[in-house]
């Protein structure tokens, strides 16, 4: 290897060389590749492509030319890089889903929203669009500076005239070294209105500009959620804009629904979006979707169809899709552009100010150019006028000259003409010597003088020049402006949760003995008088019956406590809403129960984070525990331990308390104990608890409830044979925790063991459910108030092999109030007893009443008289028992 001469070797520190070389590279990428110019919104490659199209005459009125020809010309003259980078840039300018206002009119396959690439450049053709001409208009009138190309053999524009604000109209994105830009597209009409407002009020605020420019306007349309992100981006140059697909929920027959997506967020790959949805369904992260189809076509546009299972809530599924898929995404705004050749972060007003200044410069330079041309022409016309005034002398002088040069010099000396004027006279044809041509020259000269005066007036007055800019922008707006595509929705969408999409209403959740669960509107059940037959609450399977029932709001939490001492959580709306006769869905489809685990208690809670509330637990063996509600604020899908106990024990009931209540525990043999809640110290979530009541042989806990110290509430007792009564809470004295309790009812074969012990105020309705699925709703105030030892009065007449399985309180609301004149009538029986007929409670939908089925509604008068006499005998027996009441068993 030959040695290099010493003079060609320069020793440098490697650290300095790396620093300087990398800086040179970085600046080259920033200035000459990745960032757009603030004036025309174009990167060098886009500018060179458009200029190349213009130079080749590929205007909209000409035929398409092969893309390979365009790419080759641009690469050879202006852009010495790979042909693929040039072609990809041109393809993007032709895509109507990438550019709000496409700058290239492509013919052939130019890609799709599914990420499909364009066909090879040898197959596609292109030309300029009409709006592209406005970027290049007046480029040959010295409106911008030209620079040498890469080899110095060609000239290329340093910037385009850009007669519309392309930087914001089509946006830009690019990654440089140490910085990146991401500018969203906007609506041309709004942008030009904003520029016009700025031109009239240079001190305009960004808030005032936003009255004209609402926000980005994406080519794929869709929705923008809220204006806070837009405002932040416009004020600072940086911000995050929430984009969302446009989706509607359609009915598809049979009570089924589908979600149809017709617009997707900007720059989202539709095929990948669909794959993501399918992946979530496959992994069971989103439940309730039965089918997913892409029905997009040229005729219908974007159309992605998502079929929803019949028992699923389409609104909730759609909300989850927004959260977990690209159906909702964000656009990170970073408005960096080249300002005077340097990268700078700009806000909305700065972008418009720089554009307006560029337009003023373009119009000023064009005016100056036109003025020069007009003066040059006027100068020539002045010479021609002189020639026509002295035509004979001009002809004589020319004839006497030996050469053109001598003739020109003679004309200049004799008639005081310039070289250009003399040359124009020598070039003048003889036909211009006619009288008609002389008149034309005079008319043209006078017009030029007026035109020169107008041009000088424009240059002399900045306001006149600015008005010209306004007029030209207005013309472009009227020609190319269109309606906004992207809708901006106002509201707190950033924190949108499932319940925001669910109307809040009172519901009933039922759980059957065989663990089938469902929800119904509370208005499904209608109020009846004591002793009514009830309505069919569900069509139960053989040997199945409703075992539990709670009322709550669709937005409330439902805590499910199991016999094994575990707790699970659902929102009210997450339980499927089914028909009144439906059996429901298996509870294991809603919550992940363990083997041999059944729900023992369901309670509704509004705020799980509350520090002022507690949960009190009672087990079958008389163990009681108090734990803070906040311990249960985070319940996993697979549940958590709520209480620990021995293997032969199980959880009976849970109650929500304020911490200052009295605890009431009742047993199946009609014992009840009352003690202050304060005697129970709060324990951890997994703690075992302490003894609450001492049980006799064969007895077990069936009820748990709470009451205030000076409460006017009453204790409601319901037995398995359909008897019940109310007794004032204060009839039960306070005792120490762990005692045996006092008698709360007399148990006989007629009324049976106690199935429910709870507290009431008298303002509630009561729902009584039998093992046959029959539900009756009655006013608690209609139930007789008796002493502690009374058996109670009949609340519901039971058929053979029927017994009361569960009882629940329902708060009265407006839907439950019936109008005597319109919804109920009263009749008097032969023995003077007033009996009220059933009332129909209107559904929430106006004009649509729910007519519930009546079980064995045909009853004769004799049955009614027997019922009254039996009730009278019950009351006599209760009085006898009261006189023999013993406080302690």
Swiss-Prot record:
It comes from Staphylococcus aureus. Pfam families: DNA_gyraseA_C (PF03989), DNA_topoisoIV (PF00521). Residues 813-823, 876-889 have a biased composition (Acidic residues). SMART domains: TOP4c. CDD domains: TOP4c (cd00187). It is an enzyme of class 5 (isomerase). HAMAP family: GyrA. Gene3D superfamilies: 3.30.1360.40, DNA gyrase/topoisomerase IV, subunit A, C-terminal, Topoisomerase II, domain 5, Topoisomerase, domain 3. Few gyrases are as efficient as E.coli at forming negative supercoils. Not all organisms have 2 type II topoisomerases; in organisms with a single type II topoisomerase this enzyme also has to decatenate newly replicated chromosomes. This is DNA gyrase subunit A. InterPro entries: GyrA, GyrA/parC_rep, Gyrase/topoIV_suA_C, Topo_IIA-like_dom_sf, Topo_IIA_A/C_ab, Topo_IIA_A_a_sf, Topo_IIA_dom_A, Type_II_DNA_Topoisomerases. The active site is at 123 (o-(5'-phospho-dna)-tyrosine intermediate).
